[in-house]
């Protein structure tokens, strides 16, 4: 094992010990990187590109739990649902009629916590209404995902992570708060993240 991989495994083990799960974002990874972490015992992997999701589910072990974390186009719902276990980036109620055709799919509601018009996600003021629609369609929803703008200040991220955690705490049947990436996972964990999304950090962990 090289030092980068050893350090990454230590990081993952420490997160597990603290009660935080990790979805390994393999967007920029070679197939060999995926298998290296698979062989170390990790099973949650995230893809944002549909073609790669399809290709990798075809060549990797079937016990990998694939998460889709990219933008969702209506015409791609079938492809995503056939190859992923969880969609972390659900952000449009108009997708529900197609999602209900795939009873095994699970979703997380992506929150547009910044409220910026150019950001994906459900606005905070619309969350309750969207949850009602999800329940009407009998879609399995496990919680929320949030991804604040990367150029946000630490203080701004603290505020947004805190606000997201308060929203999460209102829904006691939800178990997953996907919050924190390679850039800000430590901060997100201070505010109650249960799932981090780490990619490049694990390949460059000196």
Protein language model features and the residues they cover:
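Conserved alpha/beta-domain cores
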Residues: 1-183, 191
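Conserved catalytic cores of soluble enzyme domains
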Residues: 72, 204-206
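Expand to "…catalyze enediolate/carbanion chemistry for C-C bond making/breaking, isomerization
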Residues: 189-190, 197-204
């Amino acid at each position: 094992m090289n030092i980068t991989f050893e350090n990454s495994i230590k990081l993952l083990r420490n997160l597990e010990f603290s009660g935080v799960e990790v979805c390994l974002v393999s967007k920029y990874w070679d197939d060999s990187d995926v298998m290296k972490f698979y062989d170390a015992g990790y099973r949650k992997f995230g893809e944002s590109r549909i073609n790669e999701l399809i290709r990798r589910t075809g060549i990797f072990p079937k016990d990998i739990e694939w998460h889709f974390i990219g933008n969702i186009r209506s015409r791609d719902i079938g492809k995503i649902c056939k190859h992923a276990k969880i969609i972390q980036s659900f952000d449009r109620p108009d997708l529900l009629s197609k999602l209900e055709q795939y009873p095994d799919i699970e979703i997380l509601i992506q929150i547009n916590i910044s409220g910026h018009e150019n950001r994906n996600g459900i606005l905070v003021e619309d969350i309750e209404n969207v949850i009602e629609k999800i329940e009407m369609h009998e879609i399995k929803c496990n919680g929320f995902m949030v991804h604040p703008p990367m150029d946000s200040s630490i203080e701004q991220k603290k505020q947004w992570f805190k606000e997201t955690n308060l929203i999460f705490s209102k829904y006691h049947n939800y178990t997953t708060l996907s919050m924190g990436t390679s850039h800000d996972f430590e901060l997100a964990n201070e505010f109650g993240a249960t799932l981090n999304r780490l990619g490049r950090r694990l390949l460059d962990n000196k």
